[in-house]
Amino acid sequence: MYAPPGNAVPANRRRRGGTALPKQPERSLASALPGALSITALCTALAEPAWLRVHGGTCPRQELGVADVLGYIDDKLIDEFCINSQSILLLRVIAAFCFLGILCSLTAFLLDVFGPKHPALKITRRYAFAHILTVLQCATVIGFCYWASELILSLQQQHKKYHGSLIYVTFAISFYLVAGAGGASILATAANLLRHYPTEEEEQALELLSEMEESSETYPADYDIANQFQPPPAYTP
């Protein structure tokens, strides 16, 4: 006996009427947002000329930064004892680490936004390797900034404007922007590391269910599996 075709419920309708399969996207907007803030802060720090503030020496400039040592260097900065060869080298190293930090942060941001499924890229994003590198770059920049400030302070103390001048060197806005970029990258790292991810077995099961769902959706909505088994024609001698 064959059941009438009209009594069977289409398989595709049964699937569509049920609950949707759980999706596990690799995107992470929670870490992409602080990653974007980190990129913005580092780019602004490079564009901002104020890294160190100088007071009390013979240098007429009140603010110094990496923009003063990239490309052409004004001879007055050296002649008026604002900077020397060592501080020039340190400021260039600071600029190089800022560029590396921007590159690492941009890589992490793209991984968080697009969420690639490639195994190597997936591991890189889940364990926040690019964000961690950004934090290290920012910490390195902060360390070199302190070193450069000590060198410039020593140079100003050797060339005081007046005998009793109070000389000090403080950090300017770019220094704090780099520190803020490092803090934002720490938040992005925490968002990636604290997020719950499915195990390998769960991922395989989800991929299998997704493939089954996609294959069922290739049939028309009114397709009935029972219709493909038509009863044989009546026997005629």
UniProtKB/Swiss-Prot annotation:
Controls cell proliferation acting as a negative regulator of TOR signaling pathway mediated by mTORC1. The gene is tmem127. Its main location: membrane. It is a multi-pass membrane protein. Belongs to the TMEM127 family. This is Transmembrane protein 127. Disulfide bonds: none annotated. Coiled coil: none annotated. GO terms for cellular component: membrane; plasma membrane. The chain crosses the membrane at residues 94-114, 128-148, 166-186. It holds the Pfam family TMEM127. It is found in: Cell membrane. GO terms for biological process: negative regulation of cell population proliferation; negative regulation of TOR signaling; regulation of TOR signaling. The keyword Repressor does not apply. Keywords: Cell membrane, Membrane, Transmembrane, Transmembrane helix.
